[in-house]
Amino acid sequence: MLIYGTGGHALEILDELKELNVPKVFFFNDLDEKLDEFYGHQVFHSIRGVKEYLSDHFPFVIGIGSPNLRCAKHQEMEGFGGIPMSVISSKLDLGTYNLHLGKGLNLMSGVQISSEVRIGDGCLINRNANIHHGARIGDFCEIAPNAVLLGNVEIGHQTFIGAGAIVLPGIKIGNNCVIGAGSVVTKDLASNSIVKGNPAK
């Protein structure tokens, strides 16, 4: 498995892969050619090196935050022949009925996802986030630690929900939005909205 990135989130992904007993893990960082090893694992600096050592169609996971960056790097890796893989923690709670999970996800430890939930491609659902029944989350969103999406919430693509934020039932949030940490979203938000506070505005 190739993890894109060598920062804090990449380290958390490494923890999850260790828990899942993934035998061989490598990292990719094309910005720091002096970094040859990350916590005992080889770091590649070019796609050519990855393909020579692994294969033309290498499995990868995005180990960085930020919805727009995750989207760009996911598409870049796919363009090079990479196969997006999901990292799904062994310590999370998934609903039983009509659950749709996209490709290339990071579902971290402590996450709770109810039944009738749809999560698009490339999303990061961070530690202890709680997603209730009927929620719909678009592609490449980031749901930060301890955020709560209540029943039938709809989130567009590449939207960021900050740590500890709460989105009330039935709320619709557009694409490319940013919801500040600890906010309470009480009304629908158009695409490209940036809000914070209680109520969020």
Where would I find each of the regions flagged by the language model?
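Short alpha-helical
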Residues: 8-9, 68-69, 100, 184
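Short amphipathic alpha-helical segments
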Residues: 14-16, 72-76, 119, 191
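Conserved acidic residues
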Residues: 25, 58-59, 103
